[in-house]
Amino acid sequence: AGADTRSIKLGIDCHTMSVIGPPLAPDPGRKRPLICLSNGNGTCPEEWISSLASCLAIVFKEQVAINTPFRGGHITRSHGVEMPWVQIEISQTDAYSNAFKRNCMLDGLQRFCHTVF
């Protein structure tokens, strides 16, 4: 039997992304944002992804992109029918340490959960 998912509110698919779009990417040669959130155009409510973007922008002190350059990957598209999903892409930039990015991400996610749930 599968896991009981009734208490799970949102699935998160989190990755890092290159600072500059590689040749075969949707944005070849372009500088990417620090954070890109994707909902596959509907795998989570618009209010949620907007709220998450706002919470992350507060802690990172940078604008957060939504569905640019990514619109959601295989996991968000495949499982978005079962429950809400969001994809989070974090830049591999050296402008911020991994510890800073991790701490800000956790703070932003906590703010989001307190706001939405």
Residue ranges and their predicted role:
Residues 96-117:
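His/Asp/Glu-rich mid-to-C-terminal helical/loop segments that flank catalytic regions of hydrolases
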Residues 1-97:
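Catalytic cores of processing enzymes, dominated by hydrolases/peptidases
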